[in-house]
C-alpha cells in the first residue's frame, strides 16, 4: 500500500499529533510517567516554535507524521502566540516534582549546548530548530523530503 505524503504549513490542530511524534522520538515514556511525558513533549514543541522562522509538516494519509523547523537568525522574532503557549506548557510541567526535576535536567543540557556553541568561533546565520519524524514512518524518504 502506497502512502499519500504531503508537505505543508503548520496548523494549530497539528500540535497534539506533533507532540506525540516528539514523545515517541525522544522516548520520554522511558524516564517519565505518561502524564509527565505528554507535558514534556508539549513544552519541547512549544519552545521550538518560539525559536523558528520556517515550519514544514509531513502529513501521511492525512496525519501529521513529522516536522522540520528552521530559524533565520536575522529574521527571527518570537510570535506572542507561541511564547504564551510555551509559558502555559511550562506551568503545566512545573506543578509536579517529577516535572520540575526533568526541567532542571534539560536546563543543564541547554547550558552545555550554549557553552559548546560559544567555543565554536563561528557565527551561524541559521539553524534547524527541530527535525523529527515518527518512528513508524522512517525509511520512506519523508525525512529527506522535509530536509530538502
How would you describe each model-predicted region?
Residues 130-133, 139-148:
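Conserved acetyl-CoA-binding loop-helix of GNAT-fold acetyltransferases
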Residues 53, 123, 128:
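Short coil/loop residues immediately preceding or within conserved phosphate-binding loops
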Residues 28-34:
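A short gly/proline-enriched turn/hairpin at secondary-structure junctions
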Residues 34-55, 59-61, 69, 115-117:
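Active-site rim helix/loop that mediates acceptor-substrate recognition in acyltransferases
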Residues 57, 63-72, 127, 132:
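Conserved beta-strand in the GNAT
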Residues 75-125:
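Conserved acyl-donor/pantetheine-binding loop and adjacent beta-alpha core of acyl/acetyltransferases
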Residues 19-26, 40-44:
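Hydrophobic alpha-helical core bundles mediating ligand binding, dimerization, or RNAP-core interactions
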Residues 5-20, 72-73:
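A short beta-loop-alpha structural element at the N-terminal edge
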Amino acid at each position: 500500500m502506497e502512502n499519500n505524503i504531503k508537505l505543508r504549513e503548520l496548523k494549530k490542530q497539528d500540535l497534539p499529533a506533533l507532540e506525540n511524534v516528539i514523545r515517541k522520538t525522544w522516548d520520554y515514556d522511558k524516564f517519565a510517567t505518561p502524564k509527565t511525558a505528554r507535558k514534556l513533549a508539549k513544552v519541547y514543541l512549544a519552545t521550538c516554535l518560539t525559536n523558528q522562522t520556517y515550519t514544514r509538516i509531513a502529513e501521511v494519509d492525512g496525519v501529521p507524521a513529522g516536522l522540520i523547523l528552521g530559524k533565520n537568525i536575522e529574521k527571527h522574532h518570537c510570535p506572542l502566540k507561541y511564547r504564551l503557549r510555551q509559558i502555559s506548557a511550562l506551568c503545566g510541567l512545573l506543578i509536579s516534582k517529577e516535572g520540575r526535576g526533568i526541567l532542571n535536567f534539560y536546563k543543564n543540557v541547554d547550558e552545555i549546548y550554549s557553552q559548546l556553541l560559544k567555543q565554536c568561533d563561528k557565527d551561524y546565520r541559521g539553524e534547524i530548530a527541530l527535525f523529527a519524524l515518527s518512528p513508524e514512518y522512517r525509511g520512506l524518504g519523508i525525512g529527506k523530503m522535509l530536509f530538502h
